[in-house]
């Protein structure tokens, strides 16, 4: 028997549905596969970008580290070169200063040397003046002489040692024929005075031991420079208004001092009153 057309339509529809069902999971599978592929691609892209970024960052860090290391090495090299140059410059400057000083330093050194040289003779002169030997004495003091010794005796004794220039023998005021007990003998040469000192110090004259000592001549006194003081300015006379008040005061005081206080006028009145009262009582 031949199937009816309605059954044929149903069968065709069922077949179409089955085919559609079969196609739908395939589409779903294909869509899922496509989504997975896209996700994988995205992941791979992100991983690639991240890896590239990582590589870039690592490369940048490596480049920065390299640059920093390079810069540090460069800075260290520059610092070392600077230190080397500074040390070399210092050594060169020290060697130059030690070896050949600059002209300005030479001038200063020459000036200092010239100043020191110029100052030295002045110091030498001062030292010579200070160290100059004191003049040898020519005058001898003779002490502890007895009053019987005279100038002639001293001249006779001390003339044996050299030429005597002067003999000074002070005399007592109250007894002009007697000495004060000492005398000064001045020789012409200092050697003669030294000889007299050696022989007569502790010697005896007129039975008494005497003393002989050198007399140092004082340094000649230099006259002090006179300082001319400026002339004193005469003060102007005081004005007239200052002169007048003391005169007026003197005039006003003088009559007060001269005029005595009169008290005699009261006494006779009292006496009269008393005399009257006494006369009335007697009456």
Swiss-Prot record:
Location(s), subcellular: Nucleus; Nucleus speckle; Cytoplasm
Keywords: Cytoplasm, mRNA processing, mRNA splicing, Nucleus, RNA-binding
Bias (Basic and acidic residues): 10-36
UniProt biased composition (Basic residues): 104-120, 128-140, 244-276
Xref: Gene3D superfamilies: 3.30.70.330
UniProt GO molecular function: RNA binding
Skewed-composition ranges (Low complexity): 45-103
Ranges for region Disordered: 1-140, 221-283
Domain RRM, residue spans: 161-240
Pfam families, per database record: RRM_1 (PF00076)
Family: Belongs to the splicing factor SR family.
Name of protein: RNA-binding protein with serine-rich domain 1-A
Source organism of the structure: Xenopus laevis (African clawed frog)
Lineage, opening ranks: Eukaryota, Metazoa, Chordata, Craniata, Vertebrata
Protein's gene: rnps1-a
């Amino acid at each position: 028997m031949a199937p009816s057309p309605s059954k044929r339509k149903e069968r065709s529809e069922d077949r179409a549905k089955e085919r559609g069902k079969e196609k739908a999971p395939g589409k779903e599978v294909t869509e899922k596969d496509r989504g997975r592929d896209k996700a994988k691609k995205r992941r791979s892209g992100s991983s690639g970008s991240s890896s590239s970024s990582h590589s870039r960052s690592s490369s940048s860090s490596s480049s920065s580290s390299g640059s920093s290391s390079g810069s540090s090495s460069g800075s260290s090299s520059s610092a070392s070169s600077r230190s080397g140059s500074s040390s070399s410059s210092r050594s060169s400057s020290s060697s130059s200063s030690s070896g050949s000083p600059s002209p300005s330093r030479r001038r200063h050194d020459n000036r200092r040397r010239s100043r020191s040289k110029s100052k030295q003779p002045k110091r030498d002169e001062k030292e010579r003046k200070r160290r100059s030997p004191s003049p040898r004495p020519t005058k001898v003091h003779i002490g502890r002489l007895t009053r019987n010794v005279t100038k002639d005796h001293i001249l006779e004794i001390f003339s044996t040692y050299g030429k005597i220039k002067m003999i000074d023998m002070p005399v007592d005021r109250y007894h002009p024929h007697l000495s004060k007990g000492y005398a000064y003998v001045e020789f012409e040469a200092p050697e003669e005075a030294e000889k007299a000192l050696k022989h007569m110090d502790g010697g005896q004259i007129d039975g008494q031991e005497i003393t002989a000592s050198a007399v140092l001549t004082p340094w000649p006194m230099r006259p002090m420079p006179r300082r001319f003081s400026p002339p004193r300015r005469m003060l102007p006379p005081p004005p007239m208004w200052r002169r007048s008040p003391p005169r007026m005061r003197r005039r006003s005081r003088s009559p007060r001092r001269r005029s005595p206080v009169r008290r005699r006028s009261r006494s006779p009145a009292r006496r009269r009153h008393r005399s009257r009262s006494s006369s009335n009582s007697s009456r």
